[in-house]
């Protein structure tokens, strides 16, 4: 089973296209969510999807001090990050690196979320907010979390 949080980065590296293509042997939990017509059933599927064997996503900022910062309005994208998913794979562009945790959070508030708000307004007809924050300082479960840091601009 594989699922993913909504992340511009995953679209830019064509992972979403690959997942939607069906040219693999993966059970795509995110596709099941999008197919569901009823909101209550969608919410149940979203809760199940964060416990997938593999969950892919991105982060909004990376502090040179080691913290990974992810934020979204409802928490549905970042819920898998702290514990729920068996394996977490995060992909991020190098432009997300900041000098400190404080600067990383500032980056999210002042740069990332105005862009995300505009994207959400266009995509869903309503804006976004910095509702739920996840800060990963260290992973205590060996080999659970993988950060793929790409030396180019991915996402925002």
Predicted features, each with a name:
Residues 1-56:
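N-terminal active-site beta-alpha-beta segment that forms phosphate/nucleotide-binding
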Residues 48-156:
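Conserved phosphate- and dinucleotide-binding cores of soluble alpha/beta proteins
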């Amino acid at each position: 089973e594989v699922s993913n949080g909504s992340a511009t980065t995953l679209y830019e590296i064509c992972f979403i296209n690959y997942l939607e293509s069906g040219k693999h042997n993966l059970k795509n939990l995110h596709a099941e969510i999008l197919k569901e017509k009823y909101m209550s059933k969608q919410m149940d599927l979203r809760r199940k999807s964060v416990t997938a064997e593999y969950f892919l996503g991105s982060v909004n900022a990376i502090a040179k001090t080691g913290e990974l910062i992810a934020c979204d309005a409802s928490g549905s994208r970042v819920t898998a990050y702290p514990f729920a998913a068996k394996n977490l794979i995060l992909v991020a562009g190098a432009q997300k690196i900041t000098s400190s945790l404080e600067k990383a959070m500032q980056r999210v508030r002042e740069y990332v979320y105005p862009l995300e708000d505009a994207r959400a307004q266009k995509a869903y007809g309503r804006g976004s907010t910095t509702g739920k924050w996840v800060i990963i300082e260290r992973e205590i479960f060996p080999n659970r979390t993988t950060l793929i840091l790409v030396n180019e601009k991915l996402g925002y």
